[in-house]
């Protein structure tokens, strides 16, 4: 699409730019003093937030108005704040969007600490399939709270799991019945996972992508949380050498579609003979493993079992656990953050517009929120790639099947741009 040349928007003097060391400085001061500093910038090639030099400073004169944004964040006072002209481009999960097109409740991308190792993320995935849960942070802060809870008889198992998350701040409490609960500090990196799993009907939803991400550690935690094992034979006789038994895992807390997806995943990915059936007077849905599938599954998860849970293994698979906590240094990553408020900022003494040009990536962060390196003047011609507006965000959330045949998709559609805007 053809367009005329355009000068992108700017920031109010007091908007604070995030510097390379994590501190902030007012953009007006950076520009007026032509400060030779590095700022944090997102590198799309490496998918990392990196330090970059400022290579140009701009004071673009008075603005008619600024929009004041308040965005949720996990640390400090729980809020990021900045003021931008309505045409300044701000990064959202759907792409670059003009500030004037954003409303309260929309989400932008912000830099937040990323604390979990790959192993710890698997602990979360497995626990969500079992007794763990993620609850939203109710104080208008970014991040969700991961919680684990087990009865008194499983206290040792809970301690084992908590040790795997040992570098994450947490509190432990016990109720009158002796059950213990561990609440971890809210983690922004789990917010999208919480939105994907809890669809609003009270049951947990696990997509095909979720199941494909599971490692044997996650499967082991799911089994230890919700699985039962009935030992049929200890293997003392020659015909039952090695022992035999059957696994049953309760899946009542999952949506009906998820139960079928999980059964098919175990069959197709791991070659396990499993079926769904109702059990007990309450008619709860369980996944039942054949004796051959039980042995195959237990061999897969044995190296990842907690010592206190090895009674759920055949005798020949016990004593194989090799799990040790794996922690990583915190890094800054992009996560969606909700806009808590946006309004026209009252006129101040300085209404001048300020901006900077950043080496290479052409973006920077204002109080943690990603914005475009705006003073890039274009001369017309073809519309820039990032300037194309996405109006509907369509995501597949479930494949509908008739037996084994895929017959359709269940999709979630979100209007991500609802005003007339270029192009």
UniProtKB/Swiss-Prot annotation:
The keyword Amino-acid biosynthesis does not apply. One of its GO terms (biological process) is DNA recombination. Pfam families: LAGLIDADG_2, RecA. This is Protein RecA. The keyword Cytoplasm applies. PROSITE patterns: INTEIN_C_TER (PS50818), INTEIN_N_TER (PS50817), RECA_1 (PS00321), RECA_3 (PS50163). Can catalyze the hydrolysis of ATP in the presence of single-stranded DNA, the ATP-dependent uptake of single-stranded DNA by duplex DNA, and the ATP-dependent hybridization of homologous single-stranded DNAs. It interacts with LexA causing its activation and leading to its autocatalytic cleavage. Belongs to the RecA family. InterPro entries: DNA_recomb/repair_RecA, DNA_recomb/repair_RecA_CS, Hint_dom_C, Hint_dom_N, Hint_dom_sf, Homing_endonucl, INTEIN, Intein_C. It is found in: Cytoplasm. One of its GO terms (molecular function) is ATP-dependent activity, acting on DNA. This protein undergoes a protein self splicing that involves a post-translational excision of the intervening region (intein) followed by peptide ligation. GO terms for cellular component: cytosol. It comes from the Bacteria. Keywords: ATP-binding, Autocatalytic cleavage, Cytoplasm, DNA damage, DNA recombination, DNA repair, DNA-binding, Nucleotide-binding, Protein splicing, SOS response.
């Amino acid at each position: 699409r053809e367009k005329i040349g355009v000068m992108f928007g700017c920031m109010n003097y007091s908007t604070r730019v995030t510097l390379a060391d994590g501190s902030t400085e007012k953009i007006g001061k950076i520009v007026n003093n032509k400060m030779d500093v590095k700022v944090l910038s997102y590198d799309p090639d490496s998918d990392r937030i990196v330090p970059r030099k400022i290579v140009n400073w701009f004071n673009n004169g008075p603005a008619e108005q600024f929009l004041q944004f308040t965005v949720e964040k996990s640390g400090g006072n729980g809020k990021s704040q900045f003021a931008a002209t309505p045409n300044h481009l701000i990064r959202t999960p759907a792409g670059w969007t003009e500030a004037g097109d954003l409303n309260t409740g929309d989400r932008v991308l912000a830099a937040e600490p990323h604390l979990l190792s790959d192993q710890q993320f698997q602990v979360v995935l497995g626990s969500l399939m079992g007794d763990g849960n993620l609850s939203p942070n109710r104080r208008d802060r970014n991040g969700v709270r991961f919680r684990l809870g087990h009865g008194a008889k499983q206290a040792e198992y809970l301690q084992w799991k908590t040790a795997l998350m040992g570098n994450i701040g947490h509190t432990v409490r016990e109720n009158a019945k002796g059950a213990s609960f561990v609440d971890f500090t809210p983690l922004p990196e789990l917010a999208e996972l919480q939105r994907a799993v809890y669809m609003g009907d009270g049951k947990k939803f696990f997509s095909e992508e979720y199941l494909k991400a599971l490692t044997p550690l996650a499967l082991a935690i799911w089994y230890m949380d919700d699985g039962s094992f009935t030992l049929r034979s200890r293997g003392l006789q020659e015909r039952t050498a090695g022992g035999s038994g059957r696994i049953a895992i309760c899946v009542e807390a999952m949506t009906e579609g998820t139960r079928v997806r999980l059964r098919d995943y175990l069959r197709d990915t791991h070659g396990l003979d499993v079926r769904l059936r109702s059990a007990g007077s309450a008619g709860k849905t369980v996944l039942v493993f054949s004796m051959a599938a039980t042995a195959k599954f237990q061999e897969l998860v044995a190296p990842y079992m907690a010592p206190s849970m090895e009674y759920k293994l055949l005798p020949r698979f016990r004593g194989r656990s090799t799990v040790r906590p794996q922690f990583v240094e915190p890094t800054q990553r992009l996560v969606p953050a909700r806009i808590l408020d946006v309004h026209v900022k009252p006129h101040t003494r300085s209404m001048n517009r300020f901006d900077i040009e950043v080496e290479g990536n052409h973006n920077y962060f204002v109080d943690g929120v990603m914005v475009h390196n705006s003073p890039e003047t274009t001369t017309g011609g073809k519309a820039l790639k990032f300037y194309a507006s996405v109006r509907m965000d369509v995501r597949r959330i479930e494949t509908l099947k008739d037996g084994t045949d895929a017959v359709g998709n269940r999709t979630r559609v979100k209007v991500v741009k609802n005003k007339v805007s270029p192009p």
